[in-house]
Design a protein with these regions (language model features):
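Concave beta-strand-loop units of leucine-rich repeat
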Residues: 2-98, 102-209
């Protein structure tokens, strides 16, 4: 199934400031950016010329990047952008997500249709990460790599109408002490009843959906 480009982020509270999905294409720069100091949001895609997408390094106030069907070179390049606060990655096959672990100021993370990797532990380096949206992570079924992510307040895990995201168990919730919103979409629960007992450890939980 191709990506829906709908906006499924919970816009209540301060969990998300990332632009809606459908707006990503408006931020692709296939031209020379004149006012680089004013640029805060950009989208990078494999369809861009190198001299165009590399302008990300010349925008000192850049806060948000969408990697839409990117090349491996583009993905590795953003490791240098340690000041960005928001990252969306869509349509990419990665052996690991170590490149995300270098983005120490990241607050919001969206991974959509990102396959090939299984280990989520690089995210533990992100001590400011407050919101995560996972959608269609083909090789991931164990979410224990999130344990210890104390800054996390919002977590959404989803599949699609034609593929349910497997979740081995929910023990990882015990390691998310500040989680306020826990949201599930199309998933397969691989644990027998009562699978959701770990949710009782979430003392700050405000919403389940």
């Amino acid at each position: 199934m191709k990506h829906h480009f709908g906006d499924f982020l919970d816009r209540t509270g301060d969990y998300w400031t990332t632009i809606p999905n459908r707006e990503r294409f408006a931020f692709i720069a296939d031209f020379e950016i004149v006012n680089k100091d004013e640029v805060k949001i950009l989208t990078i895609s494999k369809t861009q010329d190198k001299n165009h997408w590399e302008q990300i390094f010349d925008c000192p106030n850049l806060e948000e990047i969408t990697l839409h069907d990117p090349t491996k070179e583009q993905v590795q390049a953003i490791r240098r952008l340690t000041n960005i606060k928001r990252l969306r990655v869509t349509f990419f096959r990665a052996t690991d997500i170590e490149f995300i672990g270098d983005l120490h100021n990241l607050e919001e993370l969206i991974l959509e249709y990102v396959s090939g990797f299984t280990d989520l532990t690089p995210l533990l380096k992100l001590t400011k990460l407050k919101s995560i949206h996972f959608e269609n992570l083909r090789r991931v079924s164990n979410f224990d790599g999130l344990r210890g992510l104390d800054s996390l307040r919002y977590l959404h895990i989803d599949g699609t109408v034609d593929w349910n995201q497997p979740i081995e168990n929910f023990d990882f919730l015990k390691g998310l002490p500040n989680l306020e919103v826990f949201s599930l979409g199309f998933i397969i629960n691989k644990t027998e009843f009562p699978a959701f007992l770990p949710i009782l450890h979430l003392k700050k939980l405000k919403k389940i959906k």
